[in-house]
Amino acid sequence: MDKEQLTTVVEKMLNSIGFKTARVSFRGGCFDLVATRQILLLFIKTLVNIDKFTEEQAEDLKRLAKLFRASALLVGLRTKNIELEDGVVYERFGIYAVNPETLFSILAGTEYPLVMAERGGFFVRIDGERLRELREKYGYSTTELAEMLGVSRKSVQRYEKGEGMVSIDVAIRLEEIFDEPLVKPIDIFKAKIEKVTLSSPPENELEKEVFDRLERLGMSVVKIKRAPFNAVTKEEDEEVNLLTGIDEKKTPSTIRRVRLVNQIAEFVESEGVFVLNEKKTEVVGKVPIIPKDILNKVRDVDELMEIIKELRSST
């Protein structure tokens, strides 16, 4: 199965369980599918080999998840050495990765996996607070419990603090000792995005000019390197994001990017706009293409959004 076939499989699977999807074919992009069902919004990257996922793609994907209050996910078939196992969660640069079968099991039956693949084997997460309660209830010291498990006292202390993962053998032994489930399911829709930085420098002079202008108008600008748009911009305290594309001139590649942004904007309930170093104004789909000169002349964000609204309604 190649990447295109994998993306098709994932998209059809999502559609079969009630998701609306938008496919985003953009070379080197940080996501290939946008999917939504009720309040769940997913940005999904598909790769046959998840080891080809880059840190730059991961950072962009985490930025998008944070900006849109969405979930970021990697769906693949194998690493460079092994196939991804059913019911097992993998991780690349803070983004959870699963195979299509595992994703279907989660979304169709809300059965979250228990096992995480890390260096050295398979591990699970323990409910540390419950473990401490049970240890104290049964009257074991941390040293006594450590001896029963064949681990160090510091390891038991880490388990109780919820720090790190626990080997499957140790988890089984704990549940045998206390006769109670202690393994916590892994919520793959909660990627580690809390520490992602939203600041990233522009890549060229035109980007810098446009970003500086938008910031002077009072908008925040978050650079996205691996997407059809160059940045996500928004006015402070406003909910609507503006997917902002930038290019020197209109080319077939530009139009293709505009069409992708038009498709994405609908799913993430946002507006789209492209700023070009040209004189002509036009609209592709519902996305206006405006000259940089127009952007330079607007007085505030309200005027910019009014221009975008008027251009959209003119089609």
UniProtKB/Swiss-Prot annotation:
DNA-binding region, residues: 142-161
Official protein name in the record: Putative HTH-type transcriptional regulatory protein PF1851
Pfam families to which the protein is assigned, alphabetical: HTH_3
Keyword DNA-binding: yes
Family matches, as SUPFAM superfamilies: lambda repressor-like DNA-binding domains (SSF47413)
InterPro entries: Arc_TR_HTH, Cro/C1-type_HTH, Lambda_DNA-bd_dom_sf
NCBIfam families linked: PRK04140.1
GO MF entries: DNA binding; DNA-binding transcription factor activity
Organism per entry: Pyrococcus furiosus (strain ATCC 43587 / DSM 3638 / JCM 8422 / Vc1)
Assigned keywords, A-Z: DNA-binding, Transcription, Transcription regulation
All copies of domain HTH cro/C1-type, residue ranges: 131-189
Domain of life: Archaea
